[in-house]
């Protein structure tokens, strides 16, 4: 390798500085890969390349990593900082030998044998000039821009045409100390290291570029030849009394309507546009958990992303983040309502495939869609779909639609060999631009049909949207899930492939709820969501600034010291910082008087802010319920609090998709923290410390509307033990409207009929609609709910339930 200060390398670096734009994956290798700055470090690259090392040099300088041009000097042994598996590929003739690099491995291993305290980190580094996976019939482009083993001439063309799309990916470091101790230090180990590294680089390339893209028409013909589609076409022809040719043409029309037409060129253009858009809209995108997903890709998993659905921005945000995290944007299941010009064709070329809201018993369409989905899985394309079926209008997760999850499980049952893994994804925003529209729809206004004019209208409103949040939850590998749910599933399916297993529908429902729970497990507690939670729990949606900051400090401490899950993310900074962020985004108002500053939510903004509160209310609902028990009882035991929480938790779990694994432990940890913070005191019983009553009342306020709903339900059940589920749902909704009108409750979810349906289903599951005469459980929970309400609210509920027009 020429010297760092040689004229040739200086010239090369100057040229690349102007032609090359490099994206680093991950953005912070020290933090994401746990690199140790105190230990020696060497880089491992697949192929010796001056241009690759020049690009790496630029990045290492910015990141504070050792330069690849600086030799590695350890205990008097001098070795190159970069170890390559292959020599350069010349324009003609044979590739240069890699023996010098293997000798470097040997020297480094030998030093470890002599120095037991030494531990060099070997960091694999992959460089990609463009990320085009290529097409099945794209031979000319592959010949000109062959990426894996280019000659210097091809590399020059790649830098010229693809230099603005250069990616440098760092991987987890390998400990040479571990290798030397476990496997020895001879030449055989050096060769083994090289072989393992080659496999790593091959897998890494597939993660970065994805599988080869199919020719769309060729794929259609291949799908139409499948046994299941041939059978579906024959049945369509017989049932509709048409020819098989006509039925086949219908199937082709369905395929054309459904199938994506992924274009790498469009993705590159979209990447530039979206970079501009995110920089204009957001002050930052916070990402948590991407490394575990990269590893799943690397290990050969078929990945299915299942995000929550807040906004049309979701389609763009997740694909963009995955692209910049070194993964291929997924094929996205989009509603057919988004297939309008010009967005539809663009979405399709960006990887969207379109699905009808309902298949309406259309067996041919179902067969076509199922076969297409199977093909995506078989070819190794990652897939994304929204299990809620539509965007949440309240900020809470919607009950899942199970159709796509059922189809995914059926694909596994039909014999996908690779592990298929669902990845729950929490998407959050400091500002959702559709929130105002959502509340109009909830108040009865008809939903507008998507069109190009809506797009232009949205663009006009672009402004400072704060920050976005992408948190990857705990993955669910379907083969493992099936082993847990139905241990003999492989045998059952093999014995009778056409027979639907009796356990399948319950398993799909369990899986769908588990996905939603793990989405909520990965929630992002941000400045906007936390501040909304506090202010909406106050009497007039207003607090003195110092009190608001103090309450936020308490919530931050609670989330950090008693974490909801390890996948949850918490805003950086203290309460003062969070309030300032909210004010800068104009989400809250501030008024000064001689006694200080008051932060409030304007009356016309209060309903909108419930959306952001609802994103994270599940994180605080148990602490809030605990606070409600404490503030409504002068003295109360831990056992009594745990009993109340345990009674309400099944309903909270169903309503808010909660997944606390050890409820008693969690309750005790929250109580211990409240005692440690000086808010609660404990002798034989627990009581609120008088000077901190206001803080405890604020914490208790977040659960008040939920308790009011439960009080309505259990007062009705206790008063009319034999009422039907449908009656309970309709009368609960009617009573909620009355309560809201009398007591000023404006939260949209309070009047959501679907929520009362969810609760009634859970109540039936728990046995509250049984024919048993003993209703002590219902009466106990009714009394508990009533005891935690304000007297005026309790009186309204009790009086309304016993009134003639209700019964």
Swiss-Prot record:
Per UniProt, the short sequence motif HXXXXD motif occupies residue numbers: 308-313
Q: Which GO terms describe its cellular component?
A: plasma membrane
UniProt-recorded Gene Ontology molecular function terms: glycerol-3-phosphate O-acyltransferase activity
EC number(s) on record? 2.3.1.15
Q: Which domain of life is it from?
A: Bacteria
Q: Which Gene Ontology biological process is one annotated for this entry?
A: CDP-diacylglycerol biosynthetic process
Protein name per UniProt: Glycerol-3-phosphate acyltransferase
């Amino acid at each position: 390798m020429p010297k760092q200060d040689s004229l040739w390398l200086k010239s090369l670096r100057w040229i690349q500085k102007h032609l090359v734009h490099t994206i680093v994956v991950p953005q912070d290798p020290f933090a994401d890969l746990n690199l140790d700055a105190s230990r020696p470090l060497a880089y491992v690259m697949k192929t010796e390349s001056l241009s690759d090392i020049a690009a790496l040099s630029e990045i290492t300088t910015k990141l504070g990593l050792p330069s690849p041009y600086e030799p590695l000097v350890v205990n008097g042994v001098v070795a190159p900082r970069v170890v390559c598996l292959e020599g350069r590929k010349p324009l003609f003739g044979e590739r240069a030998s890699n023996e010098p690099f293997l000798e470097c491995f040997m020297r480094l291993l030998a030093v470890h044998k002599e120095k037991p305290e030494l531990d060099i980190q070997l960091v694999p580094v992959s460089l990609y000039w463009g990320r085009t996976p290529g097409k099945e019939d794209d031979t000319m482009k592959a010949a000109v821009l062959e990426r894996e083993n280019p000659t210097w001439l091809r590399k020059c063309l790649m830098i010229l045409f693809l230099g603005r799309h250069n990616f440098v990916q760092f991987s987890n470091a390998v400990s040479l100390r571990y290798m030397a101790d476990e496997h020895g230090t001879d030449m055989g180990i050096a060769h083994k290291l090289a072989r393992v590294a080659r496999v790593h680089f091959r897998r890494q390339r597939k993660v970065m570029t994805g599988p080869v893209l199919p020719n769309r028409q060729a794929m259609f013909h291949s799908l139409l030849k499948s046994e299941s589609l041939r059978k579906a076409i024959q049945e369509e022809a017989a049932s509709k009394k048409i020819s098989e040719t006509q039925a086949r043409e219908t199937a082709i029309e369905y395929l054309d309507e459904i199938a994506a037409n992924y274009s790498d060129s469009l993705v590159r253009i979209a990447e530039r546009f979206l970079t501009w858009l995110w920089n204009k809209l957001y002050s930052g995108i916070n990402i948590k958990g991407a490394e575990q997903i990269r590893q799943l890709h690397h290990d050969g998993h078929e990945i299915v992303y299942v995000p929550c659905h807040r906004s049309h921005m979701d389609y763009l945000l997740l694909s963009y983040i995955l692209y910049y995290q070194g993964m291929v944007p997924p094929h996205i299941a989009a509603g057919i309502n988004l297939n309008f010009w010009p967005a539809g064709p663009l979405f399709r070329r960006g990887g969207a495939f379109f699905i009808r809201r309902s298949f309406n018993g259309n067996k041919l369409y179902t067969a076509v869609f199922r076969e297409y989905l199977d093909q995506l899985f078989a070819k190794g394309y990652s897939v994304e779909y929204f299990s809620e079926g539509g965007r949440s209008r309240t900020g809470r997760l919607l009950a899942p639609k199970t159709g796509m999850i059922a189809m995914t499980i059926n694909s596994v049952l039909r014999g996908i060999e690779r592990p298929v893994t669902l990845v729950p994804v929490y998407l959050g925003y400091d500002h959702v631009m559709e929130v105002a529209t959502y509340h109009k729809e909830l108040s009865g206004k008809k939903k507008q049909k998507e069109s190009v004019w809506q797009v232009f209208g949205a663009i006009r409103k672009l402004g400072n949207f704060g920050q976005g949040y992408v948190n990857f939850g705990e993955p669910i590998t379907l083969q493992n899930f099936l082993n847990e749910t139905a241990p003999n599933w492989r045998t059952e399916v093999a014995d009778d492939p056409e027979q639907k297993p009796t356990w399948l529908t319950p398993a799909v429902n369990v899986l769908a709820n588990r996905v939603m729970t793990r989405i909520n497990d990965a929630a992002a507690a941000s400045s906007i969501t936390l501040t909304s939670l506090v202010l909406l729990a106050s009497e007039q949606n207003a607090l003195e600034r110092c009190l608001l900051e103090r309450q936020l400090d308490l919530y931050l401490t609670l989330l950090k010291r008693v974490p909801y899950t390890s996948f949850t993310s918490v805003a950086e900074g203290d309460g003062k910082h969070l309030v300032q962020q909210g004010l800068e985004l104009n989400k809250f108002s501030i008024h000064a008087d001689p006694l200080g500053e008051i932060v409030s939510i304007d009356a016309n903004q209060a309903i909108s802010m419930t959306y952001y509160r609802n994103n994270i209310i599940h994180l605080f609902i148990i602490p809030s319920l605990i606070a409600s028990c404490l503030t409504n009882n002068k003295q109360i035991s831990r056992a009594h609090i745990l009993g109340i929480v345990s009674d309400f938790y099944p309903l909270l779990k169903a309503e808010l998709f909660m997944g606390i694994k050890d409820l008693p432990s969690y309750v005790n940890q929250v109580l211990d923290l409240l005692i440690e913070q000086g808010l609660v005191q404990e002798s034989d019983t627990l009581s609120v410390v008088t000077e901190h009553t206001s803080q405890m009342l604020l914490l208790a306020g977040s659960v008040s509307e939920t308790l009011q709903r439960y009080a309505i339900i259990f007062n009705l059940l206790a008063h009319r033990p034999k009422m039907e589920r449908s009656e309970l749902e309709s009368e609960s909704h009617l009573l909620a409207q009355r309560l809201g009108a009398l007591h000023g409750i404006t939260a949209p979810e309070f009047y959501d009929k679907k929520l009362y349906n969810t609760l009634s289903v859970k109540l039936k599951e728990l046995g509250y609609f049984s024919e048993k005469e003993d209703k002590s459980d219902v009466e106990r929970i009714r009394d508990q709910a009533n005891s935690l309400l304000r007297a005026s609210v309790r009186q309204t509920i009790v009086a309304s339930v016993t009134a003639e027009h209700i019964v």
